[in-house]
């Protein structure tokens, strides 16, 4: 693994990486393509065969200006010359509209919708969650099956459905796809569980948008033991979209206990960022700009049965 400073590197780095992969015998590459990458032409010249659309939620409005503009930049990938398969989350309103557009405008493209809804081609028919993972049953054009995963959250069930759609569309057998997906381990810092018998369950997640925080909290509320409390320790980044700060605060109120602290303030004063969050948090919250102090407070105050996000 090599560290990268951007989700999608600059065009020279992208082409260099692909060249090196091919020289080493790689036949397939999975790439996360950011809206910035599409807008700044970082992936021009890349021959994409299949693409997944996961969601459109508030982020990067300091760059794109509006949700509509943000969505249309993401949609560019699905009009890529030579693209053969589009696998789209139709539980997402923009995704559902995009799938409809593509079916009408691109008869050459195989479009598969995935999600919990009845209209999904790759449909999640059953979902059961626990603190150590989840069980997901799927009905697909390639058959039905079930996968037991160590991942957490309905959004990760959707992600598994997306992987099934992309891989099966490319000719991989459903049973082998499900067996492979069962082996996936959570990425560090993404619903990453820290468990000790004498301490509360601590879950570390990257959630830096209102939607992501809302989904992380909903996931943990589903698995929280009866009588236990869910603590949310969070902050917002500096020198980025200020409009999402009160939305993050509002999302955090779905937890039982809220702790507000710093999260990469960059060049802004940490307390100024916190002051932008606080008006949306009606319940009493513990506030401390020092992140270590805030985390230590939550761990010290939580019971063994509690969960800390």
Predicted features by range, described:
Residues 2-34:
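Conserved nucleotide-sensing/catalytic segment adjacent to the nucleotide-binding pocket
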Residues 281, 287-309:
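C-terminal structured "cap/appendage" subdomains that terminate the fold
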Residues 37-44:
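Conserved helix/coil segment N-terminal to the catalytic DExD/H
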Residues 84, 228, 306:
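Glycine-centered, small-residue-biased loops immediately flanking beta-strands
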Residues 205:
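Conserved phosphate/oxyanion-binding catalytic-loop motifs
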Residues 22-31, 48-202, 278-282, 286:
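Acidic, Mg2+-coordinating active-site environments of NTP-dependent enzymes
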Residues 44-56, 227-233:
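Inter-motif core of Ras-like GTPase G domains
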Residues 186-189, 211-213, 218-283, 291:
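Active-site beta-alpha connecting loops in nucleotide-dependent enzymes
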């Amino acid at each position: 693994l090599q560290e990268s400073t951007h989700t999608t590197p600059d065009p020279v780095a992208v082409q260099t990486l692909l060249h090196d992969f091919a020289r080493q015998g790689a036949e397939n590459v999975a790439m996360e393509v950011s809206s910035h990458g599409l807008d700044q032409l970082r992936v021009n010249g890349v021959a994409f065969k299949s693409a997944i659309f996961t969601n459109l939620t508030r982020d990067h409005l300091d760059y794109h200006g509006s949700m509509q503009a943000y969505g249309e930049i993401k949609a560019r990938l699905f009009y890529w010359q030579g693209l053969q398969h589009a696998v789209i989350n139709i539980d997402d309103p923009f995704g559902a509209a995009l799938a409809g557009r593509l079916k009408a405008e691109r008869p050459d493209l195989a479009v598969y919708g995935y999600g919990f809804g009845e209209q999904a081609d790759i449909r999640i028919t059953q979902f059961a969650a626990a603190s150590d993972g989840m069980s997901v049953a799927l009905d697909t054009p390639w058959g039905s099956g079930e996968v037991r995963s160590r991942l957490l959250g309905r959004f990760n069930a959707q992600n598994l459905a997306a992987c099934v759609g992309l891989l099966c569309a490319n000719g991989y057998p459903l049973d082998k796809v499900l067996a492979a997906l069962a082996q996936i381990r959570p990425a560090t810092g993404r619903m990453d569980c820290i468990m000790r018998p004498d301490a509360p369950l601590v879950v570390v997640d990257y959630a830096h948008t209102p939607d992501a925080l809302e989904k992380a909290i909903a996931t943990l509320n589903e698995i929280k033991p009866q009588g236990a409390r869910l603590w949310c320790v969070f902050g917002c980044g500096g020198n980025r979209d200020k409009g999402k700060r009160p939305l993050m605060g509002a999302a955090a109120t779905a937890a039982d206990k809220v702790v507000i602290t710093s999260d990469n303030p960059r060049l802004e004063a940490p307390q100024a960022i916190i002051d932008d969050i606080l008006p949306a948090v009606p319940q009493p919250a513990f506030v401390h700009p020092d992140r270590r102090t805030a985390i230590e407070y939550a761990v010290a105050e939580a019971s063994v049965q509690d969960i800390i996000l």
